[in-house]
Amino acid sequence: MRWTKEELDRYHRQMILPQVGPEGQERLKRASVVVVGAGGLGVPVLQYLVAAGVGRVGVVEMDRVEVSNLHRQVLYTTEDVGEPKALVAQKRLQALNPLVRVEAYPVRLTSENALEILRPYDLVVDASDNFPTRYLVNDAAVLLGKPLVFGAIYQFDGQVAVFHHPTLHGEMGPCYRCLFPKPPPPGAVPSCAEAGVFGVLPAVVGSLMAAEALKVLLGIGKPLAGHLLLYDALEASFRKLTVRRNPRCPVCGDEPTQRELVDYEAFCGLR
């Protein structure tokens, strides 16, 4: 593949890595990723995927920018308050790297539109902040046969995993439901608005999520398939747990019983 001077100048320090090279950079250029959520976690994921040269990146986010977002969602500014996050993110990301294509979906992801929105992309990233969306994104990714990079944060703690992707041993790794078959009771886990979040935590966890996404796209290293990575910002410590696919999982098991998307608000006991 022939590279333009702008591409070589922009990606040179990534392309000289032996694990990437021109072939890996071409893989990124041809790849597509959709990120569900353009908040604390989604912002660093989007920034690093776009900067790395992933050819097509989708942004799914229904919320508008709020002042309370700005201590951790550094893609947005005070002037953006009240504007749709997806559209602001699209504009800023396109300015960051005009060589890639950024697609905005300023809508709520639902059982009715999830398959249509996620289907065109190679990889799905779940940067959402609520349980109905997490189960929805997981189930949609499994039904579509897409790998899923997952992240979550709470106060000073973060989690990262790669779901529905082969492990180093060759078997298919677990999905989100294999780890969490049932959601917690409504109100049992406070939101960031209720419990708070350390401002830099989303940047750390989101960057780890971006790294996992790039590893999967490039086919390098050891993606977190079959593992759950735990980060404690107060202790500056990491733990990596081994997790396995549940052969009886209703979505990704040997004989799945759920072959379509459901009402996830009802599934999570929210109505």
Swiss-Prot record:
GO biological process per UniProt: Mo-molybdopterin cofactor biosynthetic process; thiamine biosynthetic process; thiamine diphosphate biosynthetic process; tRNA processing
A single GO cellular-component term on record: cytosol
CDD domains the record matches: ThiF_MoeB_HesA_family (cd00757)
EC number(s) given by UniProt: 2.7.7.80, 2.7.7.73, 2.7.7.-
Pathway of action: tRNA modification; Cofactor biosynthesis; thiamine diphosphate biosynthesis; Cofactor biosynthesis; molybdopterin biosynthesis
Entry's cofactor comment: Binds 1 zinc ion per subunit.
Alphabetical UniProt keywords: ATP-binding, Isopeptide bond, Metal-binding, Molybdenum cofactor biosynthesis, Nucleotide-binding, Nucleotidyltransferase, Thiamine biosynthesis, Thioester bond, Transferase, tRNA processing, Ubl conjugation, Zinc
Activity regulation: Enzymatic activity may be regulated by TtuB conjugation.
Maturation and modification: Conjugated to TtuB via a covalent linkage that likely involves a lysine residue. Is able to form a covalent thioester adduct with TtuB via Cys-192 in vitro.
Disruption phenotype: Disruption of this gene completely abolishes the presence of m(5)s(2)U in tRNAs, although its precursor, 5-methyluridine (ribothymidine) is present; other nucleoside modifications remain unchanged. These deletion mutants exhibit a temperature-sensitive phenotype similar to the ttuA and ttuB deletion mutants, they are unable to grow above 80 degrees Celsius. They are also unable to synthesize thiamine and molybdenum cofactor. No TtuB-protein conjugate is formed and only free TtuB is detected in the ttuC deletion strain.
Binding annotation for ATP: 13, 40, 61, 72, 85, 109, 129-133
Keyword Iron-sulfur: no
Substitution effect: residue 268 to S: Still able to form a thioester complex with TtuB
UniProt cross-link Glycyl cysteine thioester (Cys-Gly) (interchain with G-Cter in TtuB), position: 192
Cofactor or coenzyme needed: Zn(2+)
InterPro entries, sorted: ThiF/MoeB/HesA, ThiF_NAD_FAD-bd, Ubiquitin-activating_enz
Catalytic activity: [molybdopterin-synthase sulfur-carrier protein]-C-terminal Gly-Gly + ATP + H(+) = [molybdopterin-synthase sulfur-carrier protein]-C-terminal Gly-Gly-AMP + diphosphate; [ThiS sulfur-carrier protein]-C-terminal Gly-Gly + ATP + H(+) = [ThiS sulfur-carrier protein]-C-terminal Gly-Gly-AMP + diphosphate; [TtuB sulfur-carrier protein]-C-terminal Gly-Gly + ATP + H(+) = [TtuB sulfur-carrier protein]-C-terminal Gly-Gly-AMP + diphosphate
Gene3D superfamilies for the chain: NAD(P)-binding Rossmann-like Domain
Keyword DNA-binding: no
One MF term in the entry's GO annotations: ubiquitin-like modifier activating enzyme activity
Residues involved in Zn(2+) binding: 175, 178, 249, 252
Family label: Belongs to the HesA/MoeB/ThiF family.
PANTHER family in UniProt: ADENYLYLTRANSFERASE AND SULFURTRANSFERASE MOCS3, UBIQUITIN-ACTIVATING ENZYME E1
Protein task: Adenylyltransferase involved in the biosynthesis of several sulfur compounds. Is required for the 2-thiolation of 5-methyluridine residue at position 54 in the T loop of tRNAs, leading to 5-methyl-2-thiouridine (m(5)s(2)U or s(2)T). This modification allows thermal stabilization of tRNAs in thermophilic microorganisms, and is essential for cell growth at high temperatures. TtuC catalyzes the adenylation by ATP of the carboxyl group of the C-terminal glycine of sulfur carrier protein TtuB.
Name of this protein: Sulfur carrier protein adenylyltransferase
